[in-house]
Amino acid sequence: QVSGEGANSQASLDVVAEIEALGGEAMAHGANVADLEQVQDMVAQTMDRWGRLDILVNNAGILRDKSFSKGSVEDFRLVTDVHLMGTVHCTKTCWDIMKEQEYGRIVVTSSSSGLYGNFGQTNYGAAKMGVIGMMNTLAQEGAKYNVKINALAPTAGTRMTEGLIDENAFALLTPATVTPAVLY
């Protein structure tokens, strides 16, 4: 659910079922990344189950698109809490684990709205540019611990972009088209 209220974990549960059907192991948690305690619980459950954490993909998101004049500070804060602070919470909670392991891979998702701007997305653009600054600094800090961090600014047809992109284009922009870059 893109509203940011009463998040829906069904998509993650579906992915868990798909992974398990192929013989893999997976776990869904449904943490609200804007809540540090929920993120810490999610990471603790991951460590309890597998004993290590190798990869983090920061990809949670919501939209509150309005021109800057019409948008509220509350919506601005909500968007930055999920996109920027959610990335901070997840990365901070995993960072020392990865450093201690001397191995970790972190992906943050940015957006062309953060890199170039997009009308009505001041809050989103600010958050997405913020994760770029974070990534650039952490790439330097993590290098000596073999913790690598990269950013993607993908365009994909997702639950968040459904209804914003032409139906024909949406059908071509599957998340699977972004997967090779995430796995790099």
Regions found by a protein language model. Name each.
Residues L22-E25, Q45-N58, R64, Y103, ...:
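A glycine-rich helix->loop->beta "capping" turn
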Residues Y116, I132, T137-V147:
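Active-site-adjacent segment of SDR/Rossmann-fold oxidoreductases
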Residues S9, G30-D41, V73:
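The beta1-alpha1 cofactor-binding region of Rossmann-like NAD(H)/NADP(H)-dependent oxidoreductases
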Residues A151, A169-Y184:
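C-terminal helical subdomain
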Residues T91, A127:
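Active-site helix of classical SDR
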Residues S67-F68, S72-R77:
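Substrate-binding pocket helix/loop in short-chain dehydrogenase/reductase
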Residues S111:
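Residue(s) in the substrate-gating loop at a strand-loop-helix junction
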